[in-house]
From Swiss-Prot:
Claim: Glycoprotein is one of the keywords in the record: yes
Protein's UniProt name: Terpene cyclase janA
Bilayer disposition of the protein: Multi-pass membrane protein
Family that this chain belongs to: Belongs to the membrane-bound ascI terpene cyclase family.
Species of provenance: Penicillium janthinellum
């Protein structure tokens, strides 16, 4: 990876610490969260905060804080916030796929999955994708054409692991209260969902042992990428449609300028601002990394790209979502690696 790309990714991670955390102290968002924790309250539910989940005090405090933060997103009383959460959650599917694939490069599957389950995944959930994903991408190598695809297990089961370990807990946590689930049960479901990196990694590890790799690598990659692309694009289009149908302001896609912010008026406004920075910075990091990888694989410089490609890329970011475009670039590079490998093998024979 070039020094420029590494510096750009690290800069995004450092800026995330400033925009997300420092400014959250300055604009009063952290104080609002602390007040709700002190009064054991949730947004719109005074005195209804559940504080015991595992019996392990540090973990219980973390899960309690997660419930205070995510409750407005899952409750659905602020449509803009909930729909933005859907778009962000769907964009995490291709982000995580790229991280899973590249973490396996030159690694044993067990070691790679353990790193994802107990290091990278918990950091993403604890500190946020906007801060952690740029840092993870900054240490991932960029391979050149001719390199084998970066996994030694059936990545075609990535969709199954994400559906069971990520999407299903997400849907259950989003069930309406009190019509379908009780308030306490919803908080427990939100707490359960926080462990999705562990669940998905363990599911892939179990499949690795129970079902040896059978399908070709390029076919597995196509299955996993098609699933991730569908998730990301569907979430982005749903939010676009809602913003259009409800005449919502399109500025909801982008976070406010941090040094011009006012005090947050509500917990919902603070959560939306926090998620906006998380999504914007993590998606930007994905685009930076995949564009750099594409340029390295094709031997092109960014300035040498045609204006038509740039226009289509910008249109794709708007109408498909930034992570969908990043995944398309990554897939083209990965399949090119596979194709070049096969081509070289044919030539040598």
């Amino acid at each position: 990876m070039s020094q420029t790309t590494t510096a750009a990714l690290i800069s995004l991670s450092v800026f995330a610490a400033y925009a997300k955390y420092y400014q959250s102290f300055q604009n009063g968002f952290i104080a609002l969260l602390s007040d709700m924790a002190d009064t054991k309250s949730l947004s719109g539910l005074p005195g209804g905060l559940h504080c015991e989940y595992t019996g392990f005090a540090p973990l219980d405090r973390f899960l309690t804080a997660c419930n205070i933060f995510f409750w407005p997103v899952f409750q659905g009383e602020v449509p803009n916030l909930s729909l933005y959460g859907v778009a962000f959650a769907s964009a995490l599917v291709p982000m995580w796929l790229v991280i899973v694939l590249e973490t396996h490069r030159g690694r044993r599957p067990v070691a790679a999955l353990m790193e994802l389950a107990f290091l990278a995944g918990p950091l993403v959930q604890c500190l946020g994708p906007g801060l952690v994903i740029p840092a993870i991408l900054s240490r991932l190598p960029m391979s050149t054409p001719g390199t084998k695809l970066p996994f030694g297990f059936d990545i075609g089961f990535y969709p199954s692991s994400m559906i069971i370990g990520y999407i299903l807990p997400l849907i259950l946590a989003a069930l309406p209260t009190p019509r379908v689930t009780a308030y306490e049960a919803k908080q427990q479901l939100i707490a359960v969902w926080q462990g999705w990196p562990v669940y998905t990694s363990l599911i892939m590890l179990i499949i690795h042992y129970l079902r040896p790799m059978r399908a070709s690598q390029d076919w597995q990659l196509k299955i996993a990428c098609a699933f991730a692309f569908a998730c990301s694009t569907a979430g982005h289009l749903a939010f676009l449609w809602f913003a259009r149908a409800k005449t919502a302001s399109y500025h909801v896609f982008l976070p406010p300028i941090p040094w011009r912010e006012l005090q947050v008026a509500s917990i919902e406004a603070g959560v939306l601002r926090f998620l906006q920075w998380d999504y914007t910075l993590s998606a930007s990091a994905m685009l930076v990394w995949t564009v750099a990888s594409y340029c390295r694989a094709t031997g092109k410089r960014i300035g040498q790209s045609s204006s038509v490609i740039l226009i289509f890329g910008m249109a794709g970011v708007v109408f498909l979502g930034p992570c969908s475009v990043a995944l398309l670039l990554y897939t083209s590079v990965a399949l090119q690696r596979k194709g070049v490998t096969n081509y070289d093998c044919c030539r040598s024979s």
